[in-house]
Amino acid sequence: MSEFLPINREEMEARGWQQPDFVYICGDAYVDHPSFGAAIICRTLESHGFKVCFLAQPDWHNVEEFRQFGKPRLGFLISSGNIDSMVNHYTVAKKRRHKDLYTPGSEGFKRPDRAVIVYSQMARQAYKDANIIIGGIEASLRRLGHYDYWDNKVRKSIIIDANADLLLYGMGENSIIEVAEALDNGLEIKYLTYLDGTVFKTKNLDDAHEPVMLPSYEEICNNKKAYAKSFHIQYLNTCLLYTSDAADDLTSVDLGGRRII
């Protein structure tokens, strides 16, 4: 096994790097084990020759934490960790948990509520023009308009709230390499609209290839039948994507206000 990934600037410079290709921001402590999705993504990128630094549980009140590696050449990768941050923080009765089993010593309060949104916004504040790619369970389950138990309302796609450029859902070790190689070859992230297992936002419906239309965000907020219809279409297309090669070109479109997801 190679060395652990750099977790601070000193370790990055010790490798002779002046700039990483990616900075992975994670709500968990850095655990380099295949039971942790972040480790799989980072090591897969590393095996393809990319330089990856790991920013574990940064202080989300301090933007300088997000600048310690400098601006990554290809982008920030952001996840809440192995578990949804709201499930990690609250019981089903919405009572606050005080321990975090994904933090050394089970110490609580080392990550924010809605970690993907908060980390993404802080990364954007640190470097306004950096590419921001979100993924993991928290992003995957919120990739389109969805009912949020904690707020007891329908929320927009997390890619909107996080102000991210791209969302990778499900198992991302293959799609992240496609993204990385495209960016490395000079393709702008706004043109990555053709990859399976990704979500992007646009104002132009022409960017979606053979779209399957979903009810708009406004419709699913105001009409329970429209919400059920949206979920049903998503479910059928997700099943198709896992069972039929013919479904590879299907694109679900959620009209969220002025944005198309």
Predicted regions and their residues:
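Short N-terminal or domain-adjacent regulatory/targeting segments
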Residues: 1-16
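Nucleic acid-processing catalytic cores of prokaryotic defense/repair systems
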Residues: 20-26, 33-70
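A solvent-exposed, charged loop/short amphipathic helix patch at secondary-structure junctions
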Residues: 86-112
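Short beta-strand/loop segments at the ligand-binding rim of alpha/beta enzyme cores
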Residues: 127-136
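Short, glycine/polar-rich helix-capping loops at beta-to-alpha or helix-loop-helix junctions
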Residues: 136-138, 144-159
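Two-component system phosphotransfer/interaction surface
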Residues: 171-185
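Conserved small/polar residues in nucleotide/adenosyl-binding loops
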Residues: 242-247
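Hydrophobic alpha-helical segments, chiefly the membrane-spanning helices
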Residues: 253-261
